[in-house]
Amino acid sequence: MRLAVIRYIWLLVALLVALEPAYVHPDEHMQSVEVMMQKIFGLRGTVPWEFQPEYAARSFAPLWIFMGPALVAARLFNAGPRVVLGLLRIQGYFLYVSLTRVAVELVGRTKLRRSMAAFLLSTTYVVGAFQSHTFSNSIETLLAVAAVGLLEVVIADGRAGHRHVRISGVLGFLIALGLFNRVTFAGYLGLPCIVAFWQFYRRQWRSLAALLLCFLLTSGACIWIDTLSYGTSEWVITPLNNLLYNMDEENLAQHGLHPRYTHILVNLPMLLGPGLLFALGGIQRLSLPLLSCVSGVATLSLFKHQEARFLLPVVPLFLMSVDLTKLRTVSLTLTLKLWLAFNGLMVVIMGVGHQRGVITALHQLREEPIGVQVWWKTYSPPTWVLMNEALTVSTTNFVGDDERIDEVPLDVTRNHVIDLKGCNIELLNHTLSQFIAAGSKVHLIVPDSVAKKTALLTKRYGFDIHREFRTLVHLDLDHLDWSEPSSFTPGLSIYTVT
């Protein structure tokens, strides 16, 4: 089959996968849709720590630009959560596909290289499973690809005497917006900006002035928007707040610490798989996109909190740097087959099944009056899906190493969602007992991978649990236990507990 046909088939598959309710990571909702739905739809729900005024570690400006128009339109047409999620994911999909296509034209030196890069960019599982999801990392990827592509133009045309004042102004806007979206954006643009300055801007001061002016104007606008959004009397500079927070290792420890080699040895293989073999002979020059990859990975590896999604910009930038026509050290045909097999497997795991039942269960629970929902051993539920204007959301707290429910208002017996995260069964028993004693209608939502532990609620604690709903399409990869085969059971269930 011709590569062009395979490419278009994969693009169609990626679009369909983008519409699946898979749930890759809580931040795809908590750092974007959750807070914006509260702003635009007037809902009540989870307010992540980053968006609490005492931290003010995330900017609202990029969210208004990338999600605001779609969500305002959804509000005007009174769209439900399925339409809202689908609209945002379709938007993310088309932005990525169109932008990477343009970037390939700017970066690719020959028609064959552009065609091969377009094939790789279209067949990575990242398109449907990550890039179409509402991550701040997805926005970072779009901005990084756009900025690197324009820097390539500036450097290439600069040799012919072009000044590119307007493009420099656009670059200033993109760089500022990228920093306010994620402070890690500086890492991806570090080396490319140094090269661009040395090869172009040190001789074109007018263009450099345009870049700096647009950077300052955009930064000022973002600061103004955030200051209004957080309602503080002092100016809010979210990238600075975020950087200061992440430079404190005690803060990072609350989110999980990893060895500094995690990005290189774990996260890159997870995102690129056999695609890393393309580096063996398939990269003949240190291109600007490749410099961005090196710069980004090196910078992010300095911090001990390392997740695969932090490296999303590396995927398109690396694939744009590959010249498959020069691949000699490994078989091209075999490598491409491994590439397609890897991405086919990962798109099913991450794009279709991963934590999918959480969103499915929320849609189901939305159809009836909400009493008390207790979520146990799942990802944090994105409560915006419930579209509830009177919701109370609470979770556990720690006193030393002891996990407790001190901050859970036990007197709220309606419109209450409790995220117990991965707490022990004793705390689950205590929580259920408190609400049942108060006469609450209690729903317990748990993955089937912990069904044996769920059964202890009846055997050990005497609860009467009745399964009200079950979906089999749910992969829980967080509680796998090789000594317990039942932990590999797919599915998620909603129980009524009395």
UniProtKB/Swiss-Prot annotation:
Per UniProt, which keywords does this protein have? Answer: Endoplasmic reticulum, Glycoprotein, Glycosyltransferase, GPI-anchor biosynthesis, Membrane, Transferase, Transmembrane, Transmembrane helix
InterPro entries, alphabetized: GPI_mannosylTrfase (IPR005599)
Q: Where are the transmembrane segments?
A: 4-24, 60-80, 118-134, 135-155, 169-189, 208-228, 261-281, 286-303, 332-352
Q: Which GO terms describe its molecular function?
A: alpha-1,2-mannosyltransferase activity
Q: Which Gene Ontology cellular-component terms appear in the entry?
A: endoplasmic reticulum membrane
Residue positions with a glycan: N429
Question: Ligase as a keyword?
Answer: no
Q: Which GO terms describe its biological process?
A: GPI anchor biosynthetic process
What metabolic or biological pathway is this protein involved in? Glycolipid biosynthesis; glycosylphosphatidylinositol-anchor biosynthesis
Q: What is the topology of this protein in the membrane according to its UniProt annotation?
A: Multi-pass membrane protein
Domain of life (superkingdom):
Eukaryota
Which EC numbers does the record give? 2.4.1.-
User: Which EC class heads this enzyme's classification?
Assistant: transferase
Intracellular or extracellular location(s): Endoplasmic reticulum membrane
Q: Which family does it belong to?
A: Belongs to the glycosyltransferase 22 family. PIGZ subfamily.
Biological role: Alpha-1,2-mannosyltransferase involved in glycosylphosphatidylinositol-anchor biosynthesis. Transfers a fourth mannose to trimannosyl-GPIs during GPI precursor assembly. The presence of a fourth mannose in GPI is essential in fungi.
Q: What is this protein called?
A: GPI mannosyltransferase 4
This protein's species is Eremothecium gossypii (strain ATCC 10895 / CBS 109.51 / FGSC 9923 / NRRL Y-1056) (Yeast)
Encoding gene (name): SMP3
